[in-house]
Amino acid sequence: MPRYYEDKPEGGACAGVKEDLGACLLQSACVLQEGKSPRQCLKEGNCRALQYSFFECKRSMLDARSRFRGRKGY
C-alpha cells in the first residue's frame, strides 16, 4: 500500500515507489521470519508489483518518447 507523507521533502522522480518497495521488503515474512536479506527476498519474488512499478518509473526517465508523449497505454 502506498505511503505518502506531506511533511517529507521531494527526493526525486521515483523516490516514493522506492521507499514503498523498501518498506514492503522489510515488512515481508521472508525478512522478518526467515532472516534473509531484502535482496534475496526480492530475487525470490516478494513485492513483485512494486518492483515492476519501480522499474517502469526508472525506465520512463530514460525513454525520450515517454518523456515527451507521456506513458504508453493511456
Swiss-Prot record:
Task: Please state every residue range assigned to the domain named CHCH.
Answer: 27-65
Record keywords, A-Z: Disulfide bond, Phosphoprotein
Q: Which GO BP terms, alphabetically?
A: leukocyte differentiation; multicellular organism growth; spleen development; thymus development
UniProt xrefs under PROSITE patterns: CHCH
Superkingdom per UniProt = Eukaryota
Disulfide bonds listed in the record: C30-C57, C41-C47
**InterPro entries, alphabetically?**
Cyt_c_oxidase_assmbl_Pet191 (IPR018793)
Q: Which GO terms describe its cellular component?
A: mitochondrion
Q: What does this protein do?
A: Involved in an early step of the mitochondrial complex IV assembly process.
Name the record gives this protein:
Cytochrome c oxidase assembly factor 5
| Name of the gene | Coa5
